[in-house]
C-alpha cells in the first residue's frame, strides 16, 4: 500500500502554490506552473500544453528539462496528438508506467529523448480546460505514484486560479491603457492642436503685414511647419483610437 502524502510533500506543494500565485504576468505564470509541477513530483521532463480556441489542439507548449538546442532539434510545437491528445479529448488525470504501451501512443519524433513513465493532469479555469500538464520520467526510476497524482491535481487547481488572476490583471491593465490612450488623444485634440492652430493664425496675421521679404518668408515657413505638425498629431490621434479595434482574445494575447 502506498504511503500517504507526507508533510514534506505538502510543504513543497504550498511553496509551489505560493510561487505561482505571486506572479501577475500570464506568460510567467504558465512557465512557473510547469516548473513547479516538475519539481513537485520529481520529474525529469515537464510540459504545459495550452489549448487553442477550438479546444481540439494546442496553441502553445512550454517545456522544462530540455535545453534550447534539444527543443529546437525536436521540431515544431506538438499539435496535441497521441498521448497528448488523450487528455485533450478526455480531460482527466492519466498515469502510465510505460508511454509506449498505451494504444494511443504514436511514438516520438526524430531527436526526441526517450520517455517512459507519464503523468498528465488537466488545468481548468472556470470549469473549462485551459491546458494540460504533462510530466515524464520520474527521477530515480519507477512510475509516478498516487501521491504524485494527488499533488499534481492540487497544483493544477491552484494553477487555474493563478491563470484566471493573471488574465484579469492583464485585462485591467489593458483597460487602463485604453483609458490612458483616450486621455492622451483628448489632450492632443483639445489642447495641443487648438494652441498650434491659434499660433498659426497669429503668425499668418503677422506675415500679412508689411515687412522685409526674408522675415515674411520665414514666418510663412513656420506656419507651414505648424500645419504639418497639426496633421501629424491628428494622425497620431487616429492611431491611438484605431489600436482599440480588433484586439485579440485574452487566450491569443496571453499565449
PLM region descriptions:
Residues 83, 116-124:
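A short, aliphatic-rich beta-strand micro-motif
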Residues 56-59:
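Hydrophobic residues embedded in beta-strands of well-ordered beta-sheets
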Residues 51-54, 64-65, 74-81, 92-107:
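Short loop/turn segments at beta-alpha junctions that line or gate ligand-sensing/allosteric surfaces
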Residues 2-31, 35-40, 44-47, 61-62, ...:
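Coiled-coil dimerization/phosphotransfer module
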Amino acid at each position: 500500500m502506498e504511503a500517504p502524502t507526507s508533510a514534506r510533500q505538502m510543504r513543497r506543494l504550498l511553496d509551489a502554490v505560493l510561487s505561482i500565485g505571486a506572479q501577475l504576468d500570464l506568460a510567467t505564470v504558465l512557465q512557473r506552473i510547469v516548473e513547479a509541477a516538475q519539481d513537485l513530483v520529481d520529474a525529469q521532463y515537464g510540459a504545459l500544453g495550452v489549448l487553442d480556441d477550438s479546444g481540439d489542439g494546442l496553441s502553445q507548449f512550454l517545456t522544462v528539462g530540455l535545453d534550447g538546442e534539444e527543443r529546437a532539434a525536436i521540431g515544431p510545437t506538438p499539435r496535441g496528438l497521441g498521448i497528448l491528445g488523450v487528455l485533450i479529448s478526455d480531460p482527466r488525470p492519466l498515469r502510465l508506467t510505460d508511454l509506449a504501451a498505451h494504444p494511443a501512443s504514436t511514438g516520438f519524433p526524430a531527436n526526441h529523448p526517450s520517455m517512459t513513465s507519464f503523468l498528465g493532469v488537466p488545468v481548468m479555469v472556470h470549469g473549462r480546460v485551459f491546458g494540460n500538464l504533462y510530466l515524464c520520467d520520474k527521477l530515480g526510476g519507477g512510475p509516478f505514484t498516487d501521491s504524485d497524482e494527488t499533488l499534481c491535481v492540487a497544483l493544477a487547481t491552484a494553477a487555474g486560479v493563478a491563470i484566471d488572476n493573471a488574465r484579469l490583471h492583464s485585462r485591467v491593465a489593458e483597460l487602463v491603457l485604453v483609458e490612458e490612450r483616450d486621455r492622451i488623444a483628448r489632450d492632443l485634440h483639445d489642447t495641443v492642436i487648438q494652441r498650434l492652430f491659434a499660433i498659426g493664425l497669429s503668425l499668418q496675421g503677422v506675415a500679412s503685414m508689411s515687412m522685409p521679404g526674408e522675415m515674411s518668408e520665414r514666418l510663412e515657413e513656420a506656419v507651414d511647419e505648424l500645419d504639418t505638425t497639426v496633421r501629424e498629431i491628428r494622425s497620431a490621434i487616429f492611431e491611438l483610437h484605431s489600436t482599440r479595434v480588433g484586439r485579440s482574445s485574452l487566450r491569443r494575447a496571453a499565449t
